[in-house]
UniProtKB/Swiss-Prot annotation:
GO terms for molecular function: potassium channel inhibitor activity; toxin activity. It is found in: Secreted. The presence of a 'disulfide through disulfide knot' structurally defines this protein as a knottin. Gene3D superfamilies: Knottin, scorpion toxin-like. It comes from Centruroides exilicauda. InterPro entries: Ergtoxin, Scorpion_toxin-like_sf. The keyword Secreted applies. It comes from the Eukaryota. This is Potassium channel toxin gamma-KTx 4.5. Keywords: Disulfide bond, Ion channel impairing toxin, Knottin, Neurotoxin, Potassium channel impairing toxin, Secreted, Toxin, Voltage-gated potassium channel impairing toxin. Pfam families: Toxin_17.
Length: 43
């Protein structure tokens, strides 16, 4: 789910990150980006 995207993320500090995007889409959101080492989903 969406929380697992954020909780498991240890991603690049800035910008688009593929795994966040994929995980967020599976959780039902449009896309995901990485901000300050955490995934952020876009509803």
């Amino acid at each position: 789910d969406r929380d697992s995207c954020v909780d498991k993320s240890q991603c690049a500090k800035y910008g688009y990150y593929y795994q966040c995007d994929e995980c967020c889409k599976k959780a039902g959101d449009r896309a995901g980006t990485c901000e300050y080492f955490k995934c952020k989903c876009n509803p």
